[in-house]
């Protein structure tokens, strides 16, 4: 019985994420991502404003959403792999 209880505790610890960590895409390819460092609680995607296909040119983690520029439009979100 003690072995079963210990096993359940170990499995619970392994399965739980002790502290939330955000995962954001960090390349132009949508299937590659990284875990954001502490304090970076947003994912962003930058696209060229004047380009008709809206292909992302930059993705990553941020603490604040970057400001749009004349060349780049930024979209930010706060869930895993949302960019």
From Swiss-Prot:
Instruction: Output one GO MF annotation.
Output: toxin activity
Q: Does the keyword Disulfide bond apply?
A: yes
Regarding tissue, the record states:
Expressed by the venom gland.
Give the InterPro entries listed for this entry: Cytotoxin_Cobra, Snake_3FTx, Snake_toxin-like_sf, Snake_toxin_con_site, Toxin_cobra-type
Q: Which residues form the signal peptide?
A: 1-21
Give an example GO cellular component term for this record.
membrane
Please tell me where this protein is predominantly located.
secreted
Q: Name one GO biological process term.
A: killing of cells of another organism
Disulfide bridge partners, by residue number: 24-43, 36-61, 65-76, 77-82
Keyword field: Cytolysis, Disulfide bond, Membrane, Secreted, Signal, Target cell membrane, Target membrane
In the UniProt record, does the keyword Disulfide bond occur?
A: yes
**Subcellular locations according to the entry:** Secreted; Target cell membrane
- Describe its function: Has low cytotoxic activity.
The entry assigns this protein to a family as follows: Belongs to the three-finger toxin family. Short-chain subfamily. Orphan group XV sub-subfamily.
Indicate what this protein is called per its UniProt record: Cytotoxin homolog 5V
Tell me what organism the protein belongs to.
Naja atra
């Amino acid at each position: 019985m003690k072995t079963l209880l210990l096993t359940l505790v170990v499995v619970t610890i392994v399965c739980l994420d002790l502290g939330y960590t955000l995962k954001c895409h960090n390349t132009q390819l949508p299937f590659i991502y990284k875990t954001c460092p502490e304090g970076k609680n947003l994912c962003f995607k930058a696209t060229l404003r004047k380009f008709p296909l809206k292909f992302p040119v930059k993705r990553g983690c941020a603490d604040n959403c970057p400001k749009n520029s004349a060349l780049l439009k930024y979209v930010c979100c706060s869930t895993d792999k949302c960019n």
